[in-house]
């Protein structure tokens, strides 16, 4: 969830790169030191294999034995994503935060690829759907975002960067967090003013 969403909490601090802290958490995990495999394929998203290798280098610098397993594009979304315990993935935007959270993070979601399960998160999501007080609803989404950041298993190196250049001579334009050119709808929703 990023600033394209109206209920985004811009006070959530970005995590800093801290190999010493990562090493501390890894040692405390009790992991046996065997290689941790990160599955990636070029088709996961543009630059997925490079991103996985950069992440592995950062993890290795902290003493975490992460290795990248290159998977074929063919069958990646059927045989690797949401099957392998640790793999590269790509999420495009959704029209509203509720849909993103419901699709990927609520405990019962079929596409919950991090296997995140948190009863408080689920309760907040359900409550926020029916909350009419805008400030309270924003606070509920903020609490959900904090829970995800602190307890979720997602490693998020970047957000999609949709750069929109629009002339003053174009009418009907609205920002859309789902994709470039109003999620592909600019040609049917906009006109020359």
Residue ranges of model-derived segments:
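DNA breakage-rejoining catalytic core of tyrosine-based enzymes
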Residues: 11-17
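Short, well-ordered beta-strand elements
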Residues: 33-43, 66-69
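Immediate post-signal peptide segment of exported/extracytoplasmic ligand-binding proteins
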Residues: 19-37
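Short alpha-helix C-terminal cap/hinge motif
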Residues: 54-68
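Early extracytoplasmic/lumenal segment of secretory-pathway proteins
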Residues: 65-77
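Short secondary-structure junction motifs
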Residues: 33-35, 63, 152-154
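Detector for C-terminal structural segments
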Residues: 1-7, 23, 44-56, 74-193
């Amino acid at each position: 969830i990023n600033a394209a969403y109206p209920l985004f909490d811009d006070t959530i601090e970005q995590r800093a790169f801290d190999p010493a802290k990562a090493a501390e958490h890894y040692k405390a995990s009790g992991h046996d030191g065997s290689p941790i495999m990160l599955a990636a394929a070029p088709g996961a998203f543009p630059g997925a294999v490079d991103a996985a290798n950069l992440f592995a280098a950062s993890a290795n610098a902290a003493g975490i034995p992460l290795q990248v397993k290159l998977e074929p594009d063919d069958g990646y979304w059927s045989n690797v994503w949401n099957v392998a315990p640790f793999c590269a993935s790509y999420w495009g935007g959704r029209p509203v935060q509720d849909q993103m959270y419901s699709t990927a993070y609520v405990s019962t979601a079929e596409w919950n690829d991090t296997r995140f399960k948190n009863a408080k998160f689920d309760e907040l999501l359900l409550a926020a759907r029916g909350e009419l007080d805008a400030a309270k609803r924003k606070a509920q989404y903020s609490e959900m975002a904090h829970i995800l950041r602190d307890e979720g298993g997602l490693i998020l190196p970047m957000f999609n960067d949709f750069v929109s250049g629009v002339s003053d001579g174009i009418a009907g334009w609205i920002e859309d967090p789902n994709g470039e050119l109003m999620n592909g709808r600019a040609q049917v929703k906009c006109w020359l003013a």
